Curated annotation (Swiss-Prot):
PROSITE patterns for the chain: HEXAPEP_TRANSFERASES (PS00101)
Classification via CDD domains: LbH_THP_succinylT (cd03350)
Gene Ontology terms: cellular component: cytoplasm
Catalytic activity: (S)-2,3,4,5-tetrahydrodipicolinate + succinyl-CoA + H2O = (S)-2-succinylamino-6-oxoheptanedioate + CoA
Organism placement in taxonomy: Bacteria, Pseudomonadati, Pseudomonadota, Betaproteobacteria, Nitrosomonadales
Assembly and interaction partners: Homotrimer.
MF GO annotations: 2,3,4,5-tetrahydropyridine-2,6-dicarboxylate N-succinyltransferase activity; nucleotidyltransferase activity
Organism in which the protein naturally occurs: Nitrosospira multiformis (strain ATCC 25196 / NCIMB 11849 / C 71)
Name of the protein this chain belongs to: 2,3,4,5-tetrahydropyridine-2,6-dicarboxylate N-succinyltransferase
Biological-process GO terms, alphabetical: diaminopimelate biosynthetic process; lysine biosynthetic process via diaminopimelate
Keyword Mitochondrion part of the UniProt annotation: no
Entry EC no(s): 2.3.1.117
């Protein structure tokens, strides 16, 4: 693995000169190997170790390099045709491959090669980009999008029209992460490497990026970039210092432990706030 990483790191420094016509065979083989390992779940862009998320920047660099060395090519679909650098994950899947994968794919859901889909995942007509990791038991509902390299935990529900941001550029940015057992309400957007802690509920139409103020109603604290575990979050606003206007924020209206989260329905958590 160290040799693979060093090959990618060295090649990335001279990426500007690369084209599909001058790429070395060894480098192309290395990039393909990384994408295959991402596709199978043997590698992932970010992992949680000792309670902290670590991003493997070299894997993201391999994904970026793949765009430099691949030409657009014809992609045949069931009801249309396409022209892109990245093939469909399921282009060569047989019925047996789908059964072995243990997930459901409802047409016209699209998953790019290099994304991992775990068992018991349900993909409604949605989009999952290259480098993403979607863990067991997750529902990706209609018109939801999972951006490049985003990390989606176990038993997550991404409701209709949800957008989970991708972060291949800039390459030093961390991926957007939705931890286990989270519910993301319809048409919400979580982007720019924000982390949503496990067992959290994000209400409908909440937008969270790195510059979004996250206001804890119980403590009065304002934070950025991370939703604590067990949070129930809704859209809100905070007044300006002079009181002349208000600006958007996300409001943590309550926090619950995992036991309460398991026993309480989603709608009930969002009532009485």
């Amino acid at each position: 693995m160290d040799q693979l990483q060093s090959t990618i790191e060295e090649a990335f420094e001279r990426r500007a000169e690369m084209t599909p016509r001058n790429v070395e065979a060894k480098l192309k083989e290395s990039i393909t190997q990384v994408l295959e390992m991402l596709d199978s779940g043997k590698l992932r862009v970010a992992e949680k170790t000792d309670g902290e998320w670590k991003t493997h920047q070299w894997i993201k660099k391999a994904v970026l390099l793949s765009f430099r060395i691949e030409d657009n090519s014809f992609i045949k679909g069931g009801f249309s045709n396409y022209f892109d650098k990245v093939p469909s994950k399921f282009a060569d899947y047989s019925s047996r491959d789908f059964r072995n994968g243990g997930f459901r794919v409802v047409p016209p859901a699209t998953v790019r090669k290099g994304a991992f889909i775990a068992s018991n995942v349900v993909l409604m007509p949605s989009y999952v980009n290259i480098g993403a990791y979607v863990d067991e038991g997750t529902m990706v509902d209609t018109w939801a999008t999972v951006g490049s390299c985003a990390q989606i935990g176990k038993n997550v529900h991404l409701s209709g029209g949800v957008g989970i941001g991708g972060v291949l550029e800039p390459v030093q940015a961390n991926p957007t992460i939705i931890e286990d057992n989270c519910f993301i309400g319809a048409r919400s957007e979580v982007v720019e490497g924000v982390i949503v802690g496990e067992n959290s509920v994000i209400s409908m139409g909440v937008y969270i990026g790195q510059s979004t103020r996250i206001y804890n109603r119980e403590t009065g604290e304002i934070s950025y970039g991370r939703i604590p575990p067990g949070s129930v979050v809704v859209s809100g606003s905070l007044p300006s210092a002079d009181g002349k206007y208000s600006l958007y924020c996300a409001v943590i209206v309550k926090q619950v432990d995992a036991k309460t989260r398991a026993k309480t329905g989603i709608n009930e958590l969002l009532r009485g706030i």
